[in-house]
Amino acid sequence: MKKILTILALTLALAAPALAQNTTQKINKKNLVIKEWNTEPRSGKKVLDHVTTFDADGKKIEEIEYGSEGQKWRKRFEYGADGKCVKEMVYNDRNKLETVKKYEYNEFGRKKTQYNYNAKGKLLTIKVFEYIAEDA
């Protein structure tokens, strides 16, 4: 029994730093910019692939996707007083507005309706979200 307890204590002592490291690796997203890079295998050249920007509250406010020729698209996000995303604007490679998505939420804070508009404000489609929970 003493052997088992000793082995268990040693195992926990060795695993503790790894467990602590996992908990400290959580990223604080406040005022954070995440840049993703691709590296070309032959030349070793780094190419910017994606940039995500968060505001002081940790909310994602912008995403930009890049290709070899530069920016492919850009998305901007706006939030309501409750912290939920209420508007998403998508811009093309020339930073020209292409589409706008507006969101409504249900009483549980889940997306209820998504309205999709073109750049001129014309309603294109409406997406309704349905949540079905089955009891186990």
List the predicted regions and their residue ranges:
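Positively charged n-region of N-terminal signal peptides that target proteins for export
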Residues: 1-7, 21
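Sec/Tat signal peptide C-region and signal peptidase I cleavage site
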Residues: 16-20
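Bacterial N-terminal signal peptides
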Residues: 7-15
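Buried hydrophobic residues that stabilize the cores of well-folded domains
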Residues: 21-136
